Amino acid sequence: MLCKSVALLFFFPSFILKCVCAIFFRRKISDPHNLIETAAGCVTVTWHNRLLFFPAVFPKKARIRTVAVVSASRDGQYVSDLISFFGIKAMRGSSKKGGANALLGATRALQDGFNVSFTPDGPRGPKYTMSRGPIYLASAHTTRIIPISINASRYWSIKSWDNFQIPKPFSTLTLVIGTPIEIPANLDAGGIEEWRLKVQNALMEITAD
């Protein structure tokens, strides 16, 4: 569970988060493949502990083309409320609750050209462990997975399962858009696991702790 102080931050209106980012943080974007401008109908993955200022740093042109798969847990409600302020659509569901509806919604979103975003180690971990869901979805639609991270130069870590990060004032927030990974079609269980590990490693390569 997220601590109460972080939960309250999730309820700040978007303009407050934007002002906090503009005043207290320096922002950088690393997007060597120009995916913010061009990516459509892709699956994206970002670790759970990077979510606090992620929507404020993510450019608007990318946000409006993104649908996020968000846990049906109480923590997921905080995330859903936060991203809705920024124009990101949320689909609630997980492997234990509402998973079928979330998968159906994600399928429709990809078909409509939206990017579908996952926090693949949420909502309960283990930390930095990729779930199979993004791999299964990308394989079923023969689409790419794009690793995305937001790295703070200085931050506090909360004592939660994922060591949730709160960037310190006047630190630098760097949005890193990784190299797209082409997922083969119709993977079997062994193939899903093989590519799960490949995507996990690719996301870790752009994750700075």
Enumerate the predicted regions with their spans.
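Membrane-anchoring hydrophobic helices of lipid-metabolizing enzymes
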Residues: 1-57, 81, 198-209
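Catalytic core of membrane glycerolipid acyltransferases/transacylases, capturing the structured
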Residues: 40-97, 141
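Acidic, metal-coordinating catalytic cores used for nucleic-acid/nucleotide bond scission
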Residues: 74, 96-99, 123-130
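Short, hinge-like loop/turn segments at secondary-structure boundaries
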Residues: 85-87, 109-110, 162-169
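A cross-family acyltransferase "interaction/gating" segment
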Residues: 129-188
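Catalytic-site beta-strand/loop segments enriched in glycine and acidic/polar residues
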Residues: 105-137, 141
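Generic beta-sheet signal
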Residues: 93, 119, 147-150
